[in-house]
């Protein structure tokens, strides 16, 4: 079985190709939109994805050394995400499905992150931290779905950091040589400022931290502000995670999503693992950010259980939560 996956939920347009035997991942091509200034504008994302989609598709097929006729199923991320960006991927997936008579597999973007985590870390029954620009979720699989134990009450951890570095003119670009610019800035700081720390049960709030940090710009060293924002945000996350570990008694902690690439977070999680006698499983950097391979792999799992969608019903779902998705392949 060969499955082609299309990812276009935010700033990255990606196409991945997988098969149902090792090595599972045959191709993982992508192109990421980097704004010259400001944040991501939906219209700019649409234009970028539309311009690069054909090239990325061709590169993926060439990398996998197969033709479109060899593909069994087309998997596509229908949400959550930014509407115009989602539509580019959905439109391409529908066109391929219709032209080549292929079945269409609907994939939740977050489930893609989680499933590629299972594959690459070999986790079996973990508590999961899903950390990205748009999501901050503590979850685990239970009775047919991924159940959310904790999440952000406002903006996501990754988004908070992106907005902060953009507002203080450190970005774009947000990532330099694989390192987020807040980490680069924070490594030069050492003073922990008094900024909001908000954890409610296993939920977190990052908006107050962002607002307060921006208010002290010009009054404190920027390096110390970066250091404080990073340390406080990560410590909030770790407190909520410890509570979830105590509740679930899990012996594995799997971290997926773009923020999983943070070296400083990795160090904190390794210490947490030692304290709680928990194995830390972190998705490799290649699969931490948005990518088509994770959509293809999750799509292959779904297709194996007959999860398909008619082309005329393949609507995008910008607010599609991971706990709304039935997971028959894990029952």
Curated annotation (Swiss-Prot):
SUPFAM superfamilies given in the database record: Actin-like ATPase domain
Which EC number(s) are documented for this chain? 2.3.1.234
Q: Which domain of life does the protein's organism represent?
A: Archaea
Where along this sequence does the record place binding of substrate? 130-134, 162, 183, 262
UniProt keyword annotations, A-Z: Acyltransferase, Cytoplasm, Iron, Metal-binding, Transferase, tRNA processing
HAMAP family linked: Kae1
The family assignment reads: Belongs to the KAE1 / TsaD family.
Q: What is this protein called?
A: tRNA N6-adenosine threonylcarbamoyltransferase
Question: What organism is the protein native to?
Answer: Saccharolobus solfataricus (strain ATCC 35092 / DSM 1617 / JCM 11322 / P2)
Ranked from the top, the taxonomy reads: Archaea, Thermoproteota, Thermoprotei, Sulfolobales, Sulfolobaceae
- Gene giving rise to this polypeptide: kae1
